[in-house]
């Protein structure tokens, strides 16, 4: 959601959300859940659905563009809500118990939240890289002596992002498990794991070998760990030409471990 938004409540109505535009229906839904201050694994589906529909109607009243994606998600929320409100049939021991109807929605929200965090981190790296200023020096003479200051020198952000998306797509093609579980691997642990693997390959480690995992969330956490290492300057990426494989290299800072690492 864009900065500068505000939310007001009136009696017995859903919140009135003022903002220029959401980045998409999942952005709106995530905002409403955060506004409720509830666990993403325990979404109050009836209340959140009513609020989502209210905001979509508000967008229409303000002549804002309501894309098909918003309407599709609104319909899906209504379907999930109806499954909660309908009386549950008498349990039949011969029939396998139906799972939580919110399960797929939670999976999508978790993935969206991780992607959003990754995009924000990439933006911070791009901004910080653009704010570096240098005195006029013999650049050619110094270039061979120092690691480039920009950890993504010669690489477009889109190339790194598209490489990550390709790995996600390959993982989803073979992913069959649909259970929703909290992240088992803390980002701090994954940062150390990724850094150690890069250090073991001083001549460069392929991006596709570094960002790995059997589950989509493991791959996402690995990518977030790489972004953290790029921000800290402990690794840098290189790409010989467009559409070629991206390689990750350790920098001098890579060996600056703390006692806890």
UniProtKB/Swiss-Prot annotation:
Function in brief: Participates in chromosomal partition during cell division. May act via the formation of a condensin-like complex containing Smc and ScpB that pull DNA away from mid-cell into both cell halves.
Superkingdom assignment: Bacteria
Gene that encodes it: scpA
Subunit structure: Component of a cohesin-like complex composed of ScpA, ScpB and the Smc homodimer, in which ScpA and ScpB bind to the head domain of Smc. The presence of the three proteins is required for the association of the complex with DNA.
Keywords of this entry: Cell cycle, Cell division, Chromosome partition, Cytoplasm
Localization of this protein: Cytoplasm
Entry's Gene Ontology cellular component terms: cytoplasm
Taxonomic lineage from the root: Bacteria, Bacillati, Bacillota, Clostridia, Eubacteriales
Presence of the UniProt keyword Cell cycle in the record: yes
Any one Gene Ontology BP term: DNA replication
Species in which this protein is naturally found: Desulfitobacterium hafniense (strain Y51)
The protein's name in its UniProt record: Segregation and condensation protein A
Keyword Cell division appears in the UniProt entry: yes
Family according to the record: Belongs to the ScpA family.
